[in-house]
Amino acid sequence: MTNSISGDQPTVTTFTSSTTSASGASGSLGASSVSTTANATVTQTANATNSAATSSIQTTGETVVNYTNSASAPTVTVSTSSSSTQATATSNKTSQAVAGKITSPDTSESSETSSTSSSDHIPSDYEPISTTENIYENIYESIDDSSTSGPENTSGGAAALNSLRGSSYSNYDDAAADYEPISTTENIYESIDDSSTSDPENTSGGAAALNSLRGSSYSNYDDAAADYEPISTTENIYENIYESIDDSSTSGPENTSGGAAALNSLRGSSYSNYDDAAADYEPISTTENIYESIDDSSTSDPENTSGGAAAALNSLRGSSYSNYDDAAADYEPISTTENIYESIDDSSTSDPENTSGGAAALNSLRGSSYSNYDDAAADYEPISTTENIYENIYESIDGSSTSDPENTSGGAAAALNSLRGSSYTTGPRNEGVFGPGPEGLPDMSLPSYDPTNKTSLLTFLSNPHVKSKMLENSGHFVFIDTDRSSFILVPNGNWDQVCSIKVQNGKTKEDLDIKDLENMCAKFCTGFNKFSGDWDSRVEPMMSAKAGVASGGNLPNTVIINNKFKTCVAYGPWNSREASSGYTPSAWRRGHQVNFGEIFEKANDFNKINWGTQAGPSSEDDGISFSNETPGAGPAAAPSPTPSSIPVINVNVNVGGTNVNIRDTNVNTTNTTPTTQSTDASTDTSDIDNINTNNQTDDINTTDKDSDGAGGVNGDISETESSSGDDSGSVSSSESDKNASVGNDGPAMKDILSAVRKHLDVVYPGDNGGSTEGPLQANQTLGDIVQDMETTGTSQETVVSPWKGSTSSTGSAGGSGSVQTLLPSPPPTPSTTTLRTGTGATTTSLMMGGPIKADIITTGGGGRIPGGGTLEKLLPRIRAHLDISFDGQGDLVSTEEPQLGSIVNKFRKETGSGGIVASVESAPGKPGSAQVLTGTGGDKGNLFQAAAAVTQALGNVAGKVNLAIQGQKLSSLVNDDGKGSVGRDLFQAATQTTQALSSLIDTVG
């Protein structure tokens, strides 16, 4: 058999005889020995430009392949002898088959072990190998029951050649280390004829098995690079392999008998049709992918065969190839077999890409559809091609035509999955590309709405897609609903007046098209304000009067715009009676023309709405609320602004008593300005037990925010201005709310103030804030009031004690400046002066009967303040101010000047002291002597009457003295010589008399 190839290579005549010995481990073919001796002569002729030179290479060798069922490591022995001679321009290949051995003249001599002149495109991986890169470029496999002279022709019931990357290829693990130094000698197709076989290396029937170069047990070998480094002649073995498969036995693998089909060599006759430039295939080693052909019947396993004339071509790496790791890194430099044409048909064809008959053509990777791809070398350099063989694999299935390479029809069809699986081409890569969601178009559908429901309209218009379609015309917002022939109107941007307006042909009652709808909507918006004004001012009152209904709020339900006569007629609302049958139309139903303005000349244009500056429809959840979720954390709540802010009263509880500080409050503003820094809303009353409830004035200490010291009235006070007056107590401040509770469950502050207000009204009677008639002794003090309100929420009613009077007097101008108040007293108090703010301060209440000395506050120069400067002058001023500023319920009613703080500051300036300071000395009082008065029977009644009269007289005297002190009229009671004897004697006499009467009453009673 002669085969000539025209190409760019020189003419080569090759005589090859090789012997290969190998032993394989168990699990390959079993214990067997195969000896194959081949001697072949191949003549190839090529015409080069301006050259007719030819060359002949004769190689003679003998190869013996021995297979043993051994578990030891395999060994390979290759003996080759070759010679090279120069031949004439034309040489013939002669071969003779003698009992399975081909003999030819032995003209070989020692020569090179590789024919490097046969190829110009050797990849860097295979420097010593010259022809391995182009071995699998074009494999035409013909399987038939009859002879064929062309490898592209087929006859009989066609066979399906599997694609390069067969369906079982994905099962392989083809690690890079395994095959980088291996030069494509691993894989040969094995043909099995006439009967089914589960083992592609075994044969049954009359078939002959072509063992591969490395034998059928190749998977048992260690495929390391070191194994094949010394092998130099394996690259030229596959140049021309003819495999014959027929219905009868054959002793020579190159010979065929019967109706056998010839398999052209890897570099078949049609190879010259391709541009096989070296640059195309530099990085291609092309050994990894061969498809398997199965004829005559369906098979789900490409390695198995069934049918009479079927032949199974195993893949290059055999059926056991699935044992290998087929990592992508293996084939980085491999672009693998871009040109494999597989022809399957019932008739001859001169073009491997074309098919005729009832068969389907498997296009090669570089097949007819490959022209759609840009096949530049740069395209596929980074492609490792073990996973992607250009995504165009056509699978041919015989028996009938098929338009879908993955589908099968007919009796003998078999579906070969593509490299990327049969499911890869079942649908688009992004099946949801046209649906809502990721990778697709957004959902632009509009919600529905109820045109008769205002809330539904507002909800509809608040949708972002709807807002993007809204327009503005003449200050009105509109949404044109072309589906309903209507528009939603927001007059003048007032969302509370939103309404839906239906627009129809007035005669036919049909909906308008889009153009007419937009035109009429523009006219309506342009004349809406003028129409509304004319309706409200003229038409509606007139029509309401005619209809006998109340005017106002009656909107028209229909407006007809006549484009022909350029008029507008409005029809008012029809009530149920007017809408009933047989009712004479009223004024509403007759309609009246209204002025719409110049809408027929030129309607205003629609404009887009800038929602960045224009407010959208309001909803119930408008506004953002910030709530502190951590109790006790975050900034304190600011006081709520109110024009009726009340003064802040801080209750300072000390060991010695309770200070009620009325802080300065600017009532002209709406925000309370407290002067304390405390945020403790509770009041500590644990140290309030020592408060004497017999005096209400000694517990009041009035300061302002500028005062550093604490002052008191008729009590123990501090003479140091720097003391804060809070050594042991806590300060309570109501900063956040005028009605804040004192303590957790205490009463509101205004309730406490109301109780204080009632108490002050009693102890400071008379006009002008009680400046001339108080304070009077009562049954409880101001501290008692506050304490009761804090603890129980209620307080006792304040009642003045007629026999107790808080009397004091200033001394004469030139005297010692002291006034003694002589009243009945319990045991005298120690003659020590205690600081009001000291930790051991005692009660500040006045002790009954003890001599009291109140120093007159003088100016810095030592002179006496004209008109007096005692602390008692301040309280009436505060009392008068409170009467003006607060009503009987304790609510602030006046914010007129002066303020409370300014009153205190003015008093401080008048006294000339840095603070309100007064000292009180307590001395042991002289115990009064009582004499028992005796009388005869019947005098007891007179005695009681006399005692009552004396007591009343003394009360009058005490009241007059008190009035004199308050009115600064002491000069009429004491002498100016400084002795003050008159006043002192009077009080001493009153004291003695009172004591005597008390003893008498006790004795008599």
From Swiss-Prot:
Q: What else is known?
A: Transcribed from mid to late cycle in the chlamydial developmental cycle.
Protein's UniProt name? Translocated actin-recruiting phosphoprotein
Q: Which GO terms describe its cellular component?
A: extracellular region
Q: Where is this chain compositionally biased, Low complexity type?
A: 11-36, 74-121, 661-700, 715-734, 831-846
Enumerate the Gene Ontology biological process terms: negative regulation of apoptotic process; positive regulation of ERK1 and ERK2 cascade; positive regulation of MAPK cascade; positive regulation of peptidyl-tyrosine phosphorylation
Phosphoprotein among keywords? yes
Q: Which classification does the entry list for the species?
A: Bacteria, Pseudomonadati, Chlamydiota, Chlamydiia, Chlamydiales
Q: Where is this region: Disordered?
A: 1-36, 74-128, 191-214, 343-365, 611-645, 661-748, 792-847
Ordered alphabetically, the record's keywords are: Phosphoprotein, Secreted, Virulence
What does the UniProt record say this protein does? Appears to initiate or participate in signaling events that regulate the actin recruitment, which ultimately leads to internalization.
A GO molecular-function term, please? SH2 domain binding
Indicate where this protein resides in the cell.
Secreted
Q: What family is this protein classified in?
A: Belongs to the chlamydial CPn_0572/CT_456/TC_0741 family.
Its domain of life reads Bacteria
Q: What is the gene called? A: tarP
Ranges of biased composition (kind: Polar residues): 1-10, 191-205, 343-357
The record describes its post-translational modification as:
Phosphorylated on a tyrosine on attachment to the host cell. Tyrosine phosphorylation is temporally and spatially associated with recruitment of actin to the site of chlamydial entry. Phosphorylated Tarp seems to remain cytoplasmically exposed on the inclusion membrane at one side of internalized elementary bodies for several hours after entry.
Give the organism, scientific name: Chlamydia trachomatis serovar L2 (strain ATCC VR-902B / DSM 19102 / 434/Bu)
